[in-house]
Curated annotation (Swiss-Prot):
Pfam families membership: RecO_C, RecO_N
Keywords of the record: DNA damage, DNA recombination, DNA repair
Gene3D superfamilies, per database record: Nucleic acid-binding proteins (2.40.50.140), Recombination protein O, C-terminal domain (1.20.1440.120)
Family statement: Belongs to the RecO family.
GO cellular component terms given for this protein: bacterial nucleoid
Descriptive protein name: DNA repair protein RecO
Gene Ontology annotations of biological process type: DNA recombination; double-strand break repair
Species, as recorded: Bradyrhizobium sp. (strain BTAi1 / ATCC BAA-1182)
Top-level taxon of origin: Bacteria
Length: 248
């Protein structure tokens, strides 16, 4: 068995003296593990850091075997990502989210979303938008997508400002007004008709509150898990970075 694919490094686990088990989210083959010989060497180590995109050749005698990876670097962004707090926390959290996907099950859209997020992670607020959207996409990919395109009560497609915490459906301003204190805010950057510009710190927190609730309910708690520490670390790092920027 042999295939070649591009993959984003999610993590690395030492195996023996100089080898390691590498976990990738690949474009065509999903989340996939393989053994890398010489992983601790000076040439390989920089390539195998979380957040990098690599070209992987996987070989195994049988498909169900762990197999071996031969790795070449494509986009080595890990050092830049790890140089700021929101980057370090963000990469760790994104890897934890990607691990929610079934192993060896192709998820090309999630690969593309992850790559796009990592390529546009320099500014803390923009990185936060990417992560909220990635969490939303993970929910949809696992069968728990939210309906944010029309009002659950009236069918309206405009002025959607709330989300029902029960159904996960959007609610318009007029329909939701009597129950506003029971509904979740829908941040502007998650509305299909609006772009990313002009979001506030509160919009970002509202986005994380929204996706966090449904991730816990539908994905994490049924697996006996909670949110990763990196998620809280990322949110705090973004808040601090934006506060510093506001003082400049």
């Amino acid at each position: 068995m042999e295939w070649t694919d591009d993959g984003i490094v999610l993590g690395l686990r030492r195996h023996g003296e100089s080898s390691a088990v590498l976990e990738l989210l690949t474009r065509e083959h999903g989340r996939h593990l393989g053994l890398v010989r010489g992983a601790s060497g000076a040439r390989m180590r920089p390539m195998l850091q979380p957040g990098n995109t690599v070209r992987a050749v996987w070989r195994a005698r049988l498909d169900e075997h762990l197999g071996m990876y031969a790795i070449d670097g494509l986009t080595l962004r890990a050092a830049e990502l790890m140089s700021v707090a929101h980057g370090a926390y963000g990469v760790t959290h994104l890897a934890a989210l990607a691990r929610l996907l079934p192993e060896r099950d192709p998820h090309q859209e999630m690969y593309l979303r992850l790559e796009h997020a990592l390529d546009d992670f320099a500014e803390a607020g923009g990185a936060a938008v990417h992560i909220v959207r990635f969490e939303l996409a993970i929910l949809a990919e696992l069968g728990f997508g939210l309906d944010l395109e029309s009002c659950a009560a009236t069918g309206e497609t405009t002025d959607l400002v709330y989300v029902s915490p029960k159904s996960g459906g959007a609610v318009s301003r007029s329909a939701g007004a009597p129950w506003a204190d029971r509904l979740l805010p829908l941040p502007p950057f998650l509305r299909e008709s609006e772009d990313d510009h002009g979001f506030s710190d509160q919009d970002l927190l509202d986005g994380f509150r929204l996706t966090g609730l449904f991730l816990l309910r539908h994905v994490l708690e049924p697996r006996g898990q909670g949110h990763s520490d990196a998620r809280e670390g990322f949110i705090n790092a973004v808040t601090r970075a934006r506060a510093r920027l506001a003082q400049v």
